[in-house]
Design a protein with these regions (language model features):
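Glycine- and small/polar-enriched repetitive beta-structure motifs of secreted/surface proteins
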Residues: 1-386
Length: 386
């Protein structure tokens, strides 16, 4: 062999035709015979290498078991120690990729990063103990202290941030970006969490999307939810199929399902109400268990709590309503109605003074505008019945 450098007892001692090797340390590259282009620094580094070429090993026992693996870079005590035939791996840090045997194209930076990986390929791990329990899970990216720490066979996960996807084991296709995002997720798949503690309590809930500070924070098994905004769906645990956009929107929802909410503080107090639509600042804000309500507009249906079947479209339409089965369309339509039920009001300030009157119909500008407690009234036209 030509252009070899060996420093230390038994270093490169069996080399026959290998070229351009550098071996520094007791028994480093001791069993290499024909391999070339290796750099080995440290006691027993690349000790068992025979034909593996173009490897770099720096540190005690780094790449110790490598036999035919090529183009690996190992820096740190016991980094890539058990690698035998794996190629194109990079391990930087104490015990980085220590147990890897055949896995390829992995990058591990940090103490114990990808420690337990054996045959999995295409993982990237940056941070103390990130992906350290991973064995055969492939195509994962973990950046941050203990990110994806407990992952074993889960695949195609992306975790960026301290303890993001911390205890995930077999869940796949998850994206967690932010401190503790999806921290408690174990087996659930296809979740996306972006923001501090977003979906951080989720265990088995699938296909949720949470974007924002503490969005869907306590969700555990709820599925198919979308929460965008600070504290959106923060209290949701098992509620499913909710779509929420806006700061504090639906922040108290626990088990309510099939709701659509858009606007700051809209649907804020809802806990178990289902199949509601709230669009606008404070729309349906006080609703707790009411179902089947539609509120579109600033403060629309703001005070309804437990009743359902109401439709309010317009600025402060049905704002004070606590009854059911009312329909109000227009600016201030039925604004002060409280317990009146089964009314239909369409037009600017139509039925605007109604409080407890029921079964009325008002169509037109200011229609029935003076009615307060009367029942079974009908008015059609400009200021009709006013």
């Amino acid at each position: 062999g030509n252009f070899n450098t060996a420093v230390g007892r038994s270093a490169l001692s069996t080399n026959t035709t290998g070229d351009n090797n550098v071996s520094v340390g007791y028994s480093s590259l001791q069993n290499s015979t024909t391999s070339s282009g290796n750099t080995s620094v440290g006691m027993e580094s690349m000790f068992l290498n025979t034909t593996g070429a173009n490897n770099t090993a720096i540190g005690l026992c780094s790449l110790r078991a490598n036999t035919t693996g090529t183009a690996n870079s190992s820096i740190g005590r016991h980094s890539l120690r058990d690698n035998t035939t794996g190629n194109c791996n990079t391990g930087l840090g104490h015990n980085a990729l220590r147990n890897n045997t055949e896995g390829e194209f992995n990058t591990a930076i940090g103490n114990n990063a990808l420690l337990s990986n054996t045959t999995a390929d295409n993982n990237t791990s940056v941070g103390f103990e990130s992906l350290c329990a991973n064995t055969t899970g492939a195509n994962n990216t973990a950046v941050g202290f203990e990110s994806l720490k407990g992952n074993t066979t889960g695949q195609s996960n992306t975790a960026v941030g301290r303890t993001s996807l911390l205890v995930n084991t077999t869940g796949s296709d998850n994206i967690a970006i932010g401190l503790s995002a999806l921290r408690c997720n174990t087996t659930a798949s296809k979740n996306t969490a972006v923001g501090f503690c977003a979906l951080c309590s989720n265990t088995t809930g699938v296909e949720n999307t949470a974007v924002g500070h503490e969005a869907l924070k306590v969700n555990t098994t709820g599925n198919y939810n979308t929460a965008i905004g600070r504290y959106t769906l923060q209290a949701n645990t098992t509620g499913c199929n909710n779509t929420v956009l806006g700061t504090f929107a639906s922040g108290s929802n626990t088990t309510g399902c099939d709701n659509v909410v858009v606007g700051y503080n809209s649907f804020a107090d809802n806990t178990t109400g289902c199949r509601n639509i709230a669009v606008g600042y404070n729309a349906l804000a006080d609703n707790t268990t009411g179902f089947g309500n539609i509120a579109i507009g600033y403060d629309a249906l703001r005070l309804v709590t437990t009743n359902g079947g109401n439709v309010a479209v317009g600025y402060v339409a049905l704002e004070d309503n606590t009854a059911e089965n009312n329909t109000a369309v227009g600016y201030c339509a039925m604004r002060v109605t409280t317990s009146g039920a089964d009314n239909v009001s369409m037009g600017y300030k139509s039925l605007k003074a109604n409080t407890t009157g029921g079964k009325g119909s008002a169509f037109g500008y200011h229609a029935l505008c003076a009615n307060t407690t009367g029942n079974d009234n009908n008015a059609f036209g400009f200021e009709a019945g006013c």
